[in-house]
C-alpha cells in the first residue's frame, strides 16, 4: 500500500521521452520545504461509492550530514489501521538523503512489509560516475535522476506558472533497478475540497506505471496547494477494484504560510 501511496502522490508510467528545453527536474532549487516539516495523509479505499479509511502515510524531513555533505533526510512511513491488518497488514518505510543545494538524491532505502511480502532495498547514487549501486549490482543512470521520495519533494519546487494547461514536464526516476523516463501533465488551477478543507490548488495528471494496482494512462488526478509550499492535498485514482483517495489531514512546520487554504472542513 505504501508504495501505492508514493506512486499516487507522484506516479509514473514507463514511457520514453525526449527532454524538453528548460526541464525543471535539472534546474530547481529548494524554496518549498524546510527541515522539520511533517505531512500526514489518510488513505481511503472505495467500493460501490463507499469510502473507508485503510491507513496513513507520514512524511518527515530533517537536516543531516551524509558523506560530509548537508542533506535533507526525508522519511515516509506508511501503515494500515489495526482493523485492516487482518485483511492486509502494511508496515512500510521509505527514506531518501537529498542534497540541500541540488535536491538530487545520494541514497534511497526501501523497507516494506505488505501482506506477508517483505523487501529491503538500498540504493546509493554516485554523482561522479552517474551510477546507482543497489543490492543487485551497479546501474547507469542519467545525471538528473530521482528516486520515489526525492521526486515528490523536487516536484514541489516546480514553477507551474510558466506552464500552460496541457504541457508535459518530463523527468527520470530510478526504481527497482530500472530507469524510467516519465512526465506529468499540467492541467491548470482550481478549487478543491478535501477532508482537511477547501484549497486553491494546482492540478495535474501523472501517467501511471503499468503493472501497479492503478490503471494505466492519465486516470489519476493530483492537487497540490497553490502557494509556495506546493504540498499535495488530494490524490484520486481508479484502481483494479474500486478507487483510492489520499487526503492531507495534518501538517507541521511548513516553510511558508498555507495561504491556499480557503476554509477548514
Regions found by a protein language model. Give the residues of each.
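Leucine-biased recognition of intrinsically disordered, low-complexity hydrophobic segments
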Residues: 15-17
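Sec-dependent N-terminal signal peptides
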Residues: 4-13
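Acidic, serine/threonine-rich low-complexity disordered tracts
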Residues: 19-125, 163-265
Amino acid at each position: 500500500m505504501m508504495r501505492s501511496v508514493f506512486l499516487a502522490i507522484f506516479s509514473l508510467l514507463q514511457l520514453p521521452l525526449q527532454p524538453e528545453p528548460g526541464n525543471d527536474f535539472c534546474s530547481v532549487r529548494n524554496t518549498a520545504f524546510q527541515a522539520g516539516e511533517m505531512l500526514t495523509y489518510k488513505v481511503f479505499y472505495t467500493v460501490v461509492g463507499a469510502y473507508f479509511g485503510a491507513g496513513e502515510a507520514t512524511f518527515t524531513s530533517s537536516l543531516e550530514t551524509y558523506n560530509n555533505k548537508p542533506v535533507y533526510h526525508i522519511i515516509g512511513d506508511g501503515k494500515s489501521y489495526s482493523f485492516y491488518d487482518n485483511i492486509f497488514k502494511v508496515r512500510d518505510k521509505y527514506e531518501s538523503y537529498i542534497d540541500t543545494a541540488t535536491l538530487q538524491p545520494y541514497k534511497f532505502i526501501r523497507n516494506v512489509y505488505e501482506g506477508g511480502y517483505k523487501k529491503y532495498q538500498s540504493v546509493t547514487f554516485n554523482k561522479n560516475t552517474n551510477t546507482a549501486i543497489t543490492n543487485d549490482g551497479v546501474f547507469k543512470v542519467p545525471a538528473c535522476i530521482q528516486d520515489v521520495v526525492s521526486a515528490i519533494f523536487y516536484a514541489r519546487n516546480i514553477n507551474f506558472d510558466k506552464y500552460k494547461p496541457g504541457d508535459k514536464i518530463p523527468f527520470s526516476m530510478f526504481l527497482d533497478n530500472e530507469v524510467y523516463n516519465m512526465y506529468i501533465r499540467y492541467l491548470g488551477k482550481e478549487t478543491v475540497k478535501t477532508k482537511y478543507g477547501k484549497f486553491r490548488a494546482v492540478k495535474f495528471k501523472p501517467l501511471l506505471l503499468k503493472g501497479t494496482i492503478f490503471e494505466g494512462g492519465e486516470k489519476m488526478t493530483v492537487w497540490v496547494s497553490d502557494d509556495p509550499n506546493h504540498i499535495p492535498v488530494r490524490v484520486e485514482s481508479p484502481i483494479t477494484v474500486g478507487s483510492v483517495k489520499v487526503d492531507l489531514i495534518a501538517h507541521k512546520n511548513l516553510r511558508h504560510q498555507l495561504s491556499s487554504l480557503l476554509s477548514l472542513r
